[in-house]
Design a protein with these regions (language model features):
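Hydrophobic, ordered structural segments
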Residues: 16, 78-81
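Short, conserved charged micro-motifs
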Residues: 8, 39-45, 81-84, 108-114
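Single conserved hydrophobic/aromatic residue that forms the stacking wall/gate
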Residues: 1-11
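Short, recurring structural edge motifs at helix starts
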Residues: 15-21, 117-119
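Short, charge-patterned binding micro-sites
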Residues: 21-37, 52-77
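Extracellular/lumenal glycan-associated surfaces
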Residues: 25-36, 94-106
C-alpha cells in the first residue's frame, strides 16, 4: 500500500511541477467523462443517470497528444468503467478517449521525461467520487457544481 500511495503522490507532484514550470494553474488528478455542463440542474440530470459504484482502474500507459487539454496524460488499457459511465450519460461515447491529464499546454513541459513517468505505471487508482465542475481554459476559474460520493 505504501508504494501505491507514493506513486499516487508522484502523479500529483508531477501535475504541480509541470504547472509551475509552464506558469499555469495546477489541477487535481481527474478523468473527464463529459463536457459542456454549466448548471446544477444539468449536472443533477447527468448524475441521476449514473448508478455507478466506486471502481478501481489501472493506468498502464503514458501518452502525449496534440491538443491543449491532452498534452501529457495516462491511459488505461481497460476503459470499460469510463465507457459504461459515458454511455449512460450520452447514450454512446464519442471519439473521446478516457484519460488522466498530467499537463495542459501547447507544448510538452520543460522537464518532461517519458522514462520518469513510465516508472509510475502501472498505477492503480480507486474512483470513489464524481464531481461536476464548470470548466474552461483557465483552471483557476473552474467552479464546483456538485459532488456524488460513490458506494
Amino acid at each position: 500500500a505504501t508504494i501505491r500511495r507514493q506513486r499516487q503522490m508522484c502523479i500529483r507532484d508531477s501535475i504541480k511541477r509541470y504547472a509551475k514550470e509552464e506558469d499555469k494553474d495546477s489541477f487535481f488528478p481527474h478523468v473527464t467523462l463529459v463536457s459542456h455542463i454549466d448548471s446544477e440542474e444539468t449536472a443533477l440530470k447527468i448524475l441521476n443517470k449514473l448508478l455507478v459504484k466506486k471502481s478501481t482502474v489501472i493506468f498502464d500507459r503514458v501518452s502525449t497528444g496534440d491538443t491543449y487539454f491532452q498534452k501529457v496524460y495516462l491511459e488505461s488499457s481497460d476503459n470499460s468503467y469510463f465507457f459504461n459511465a459515458v454511455s449512460k450519460i450520452e447514450g454512446w461515447p464519442s471519439l473521446w478517449v478516457p484519460h488522466m491529464s498530467l499537463c495542459y499546454g501547447d507544448e510538452l513541459p520543460k522537464s518532461f521525461d517519458l522514462g520518469e513517468l513510465n516508472e509510475l505505471i502501472p498505477i492503480t487508482l480507486t474512483f470513489d467520487t464524481i464531481t461536476v465542475y464548470k470548466t474552461g481554459p483557465v483552471v483557476s476559474e473552474w467552479k464546483e457544481i456538485t459532488t456524488l460520493l460513490l458506494d
